[in-house]
Amino acid sequence: MTAKRLRIEDDALLRGRGRFIDDAHQDNQAFGHFVRSPHAHARIVSIDTAPALAAPGALAVLTAADLRAAGVGSVSVHPPIKGRGGAPIVEPPRPALAAERVMHVGQAVALVVANSAIAAQDAAEAVVVEYDAIDPAIGAASALAPDAPQLWPEAPGNLAIDWGFPRSENDANARAVEQAIKDAPHVARVSYVNQRVVVASIEPRGATAIYDPAHDRCTLRVCSQGVAALREGLARIMGVDRSRLRVITEDVGGAFGMKSSPYPEYPALLVAARMTGRRCTGCPPDRRPFSATIPRGALFSTARWRSTPRASSSPCGFARWSISARFSDHSARRLQP
């Protein structure tokens, strides 16, 4: 461990020769800008893309209908875990571009493609989206309250999964814990919150999509934390065999866990490249990295201790509620022993 090791990765970076997403622009490159929801929860009444298409430099405006026609499926990244009694996790659909409803501030509603990044941003501001705002559920505790707005019909009570150890209420350890709490002369409780955490990487998320019509193949240059898993996920989302999709990651300016999953922007950019016949870059994420980035979900925890007359104590129970970090503030799951 004390032996000197030669670092070979620094030379190019120190000389300014790194290859990040913004370093690979080419002639005839197109740029994408996403129209995002200003609401935490709302119905989409209508989307008028005509003014944006008429804007200078605009090439295309994609909505959920375009992605649906291209065969793009749900952008879901939930692990296939099971809760008590073997019940699977509830996995509501997550479209790459919102269709009927938006479920969090910053959810992508449309993608505008233009000849320059500035032209794409200007055209995106011309997209007219009419919303009908709905009461949101903010935070895990409020989302699980009996009078909370029902967010997904697939998840009654906004509960995605009830998971924990032991998995059975009849487990001997569970009965022993409850009996110890019942018999204890004193029981102490403490509740605490681990706040949500979002990553502020030096290089924001971004990707460049390229379509090869001669071989009907797509390439995605993306700052990621592993191309193999990302390729598998994107191939499933796009509804294509993985042999038709190539994922390339070169230098990455920080990640810390938030660049490991397929994001909704990626399939949208791939479809845009196929529709326009142009390399299409979306970087950075519209100057809204926090509202468009998967965070670590907040944890709301309660612990119980039993104490004896001799002042000794031992933990007896632990319950935890968590906001789902895989979609938004409005899909809560509970982890409870």
Show where each model-derived region lies.
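Proline/glycine-anchored alpha-helix kink/cap motifs
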Residues: 207-211, 232-246, 267-282, 305, ...
